[in-house]
């Protein structure tokens, strides 16, 4: 198993440890851990074994034969690699966190430079904004971002407190006061959706599928920032790859395969593939085939486990209404579920994993398809195939509502999702309306647009540890109806 740092349990032990440190001339707890690890490494070497430890074991007194496994990310890993140590990456490959598979697939094993993104010329115009994003557990995520308008359009970067600068992607402005962009972070795919008004900033950060409110203000100058730690070409040989991690707080044997598969296939391909193998659309096509093959020919249990959980939740009823309802849903991404359990004093190994959220895969294939069909229809209003596909799914959901509601009345474990069923019903009706509008290139006036957006904002809230992910393709359709 991987070594990790712990703390002493009592004052008695602390006094004994402090005396030992004075005797050995050890300045601090890090030096004490290095002393222990040096002795342990010698024992392991005697038996031809390799020491592997998390970032905390790194110490210049340890031999270069140790292997650092990084949870702290590319910066920490890049630093130890530059010092001549070998390392593997786990940040971005945490399968206990529900995340989009494309996020894992984009994960950078080799730390990337900025390639001039933060170089501001006299002909550029730049604006910088601070932000603070409170979390459900722990301190707020803080930092700043800078957007630069140049001859080639918009570019930008983000500076999270305590982390290196990262370039941002897909910058879009909606008028002069609304903006969004994307950046992959330790929290997952991070998409700020912001409104700026004079010198104030509001809105939310979308972490995967889950919204976290954010506030901030305009800065007078561009912050200095910390450049990313990028190893030289000859040092990159010390980056051996990565390892997926699956912590057990939200995992039990009956749902283990739901957590693992098929995302672990994409992580494996990321780790054994060249850096330029990064076509997410192609990956998803092959992932679907792997999902089917691994179920039928290998015997992996992700679909069987889901059906078993649905059977238990249905309490003697048909599981079909749950299967259809689940198409619109995903478990809340990032560590949202763990943090909600912490707030409710349920963050322990005795917490029963019996919610609908526990039976859901990290990502809804149906929602991803809805997003794809919406994009096609927006780019070509005469694409009747995409319009029909959208209407088919929304109609299927509408026709399922009565049966899904009946299940929530007959199962105490489903009682908490009664509001979810009602909202999916409204969203299905809205989906058909928006599809028809986009297909005929219709528009909504400002009042109607605001009303629909408010409905989507309400439906996007986390409920019983899950999210109605169908909100996001509907938002895409809604934006296509706005008169700019």
Show the residue positions of the predicted features.
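Single conserved hydrophobic/aromatic residue that forms the stacking wall/gate
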Residues: 2-5, 9, 13
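Gly/Pro-rich turn-and-neighbor structural signature
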Residues: 11-69, 74-79
């Amino acid at each position: 198993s991987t070594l990790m740092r712990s703390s002493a349990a009592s004052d008695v032990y602390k006094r004994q440890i402090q005396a030992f440190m004075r005797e050995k001339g050890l300045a601090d707890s890090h030096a004490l851990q290095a002393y222990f690890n040096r002795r342990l490494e010698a024992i392991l070497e005697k038996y031809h074994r390799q020491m592997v430890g998390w970032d905390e074991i790194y110490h210049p007194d340890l031999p270069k034969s140790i292997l650092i496994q990084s949870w702290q990310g590319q910066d920490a890993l890049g630093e130890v690699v530059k010092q001549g140590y070998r390392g593997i990456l786990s940040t971005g490959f945490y399968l206990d966190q529900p995340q989009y598979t494309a996020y894992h697939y984009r994960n950078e094993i080799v730390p990337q430079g900025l390639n001039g993104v933060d170089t501001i010329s006299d002909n550029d115009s730049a604006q910088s904004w601070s932000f603070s994003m409170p979390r459900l557990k722990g301190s707020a995520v803080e930092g700043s971002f800078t957007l630069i308008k140049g001859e080639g359009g918009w570019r930008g970067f983000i500076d999270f407190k305590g982390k290196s600068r990262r370039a941002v992607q897909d910058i879009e402005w909606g008028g002069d006061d609304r903006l969004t962009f994307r950046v992959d972070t330790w929290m997952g795919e991070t998409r700020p959706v912001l409104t700026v008004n004079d010198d104030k900033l509001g809105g939310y950060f979308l972490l995967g599928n889950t919204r976290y409110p954010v506030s901030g203000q305009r800065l007078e100058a561009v912050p200095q920032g910390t450049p990313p730690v990028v190893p030289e070409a000859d040092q990159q040989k010390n980056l051996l790859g990565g390892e997926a991690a699956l912590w057990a707080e939200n995992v039990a044997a009956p749902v283990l395969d739901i957590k693992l598969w098929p995302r672990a296939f994409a992580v494996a391909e990321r780790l054994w593939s060249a850096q330029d193998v990064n076509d997410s659309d192609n990956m998803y096509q092959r992932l679907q085939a792997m999902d089917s093959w691994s179920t039928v020919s290998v015997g992996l249990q992700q679909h069987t486990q889901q059906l078993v959980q649905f059977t238990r939740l249905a309490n003697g009823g048909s599981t079909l209404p749950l299967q259809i309802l689940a198409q619109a849903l995903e478990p809340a991404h990032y560590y949202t579920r763990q943090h909600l359990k912490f707030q409710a004093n349920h963050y322990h190994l005795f917490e029963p994993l019996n919610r609908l959220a526990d039976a859901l895969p990290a990502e809804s294939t149906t929602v991803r398809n809805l997003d794809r069909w919406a994009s096609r229809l927006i780019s070509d209003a005469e694409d009747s195939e995409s319009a029909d596909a959208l209407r088919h799914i929304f109609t299927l959901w509408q026709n399922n509502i009565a049966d899904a509601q009946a299940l929530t009345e007959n199962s105490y474990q489903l009682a908490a999702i009664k509001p979810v069923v009602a909202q999916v019903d409204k969203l299905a009706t809205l989906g058909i309306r928006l599809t028809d509008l986009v297909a005929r290139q219709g528009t909504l006036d400002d009042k109607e647009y605001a009303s629909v957006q408010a409905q989507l904002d309400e439906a996007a809230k986390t409920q019983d540890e899950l999210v109605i992910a169908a909100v996001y393709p509907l938002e895409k359709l809604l934006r296509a109806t706005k008169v700019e």
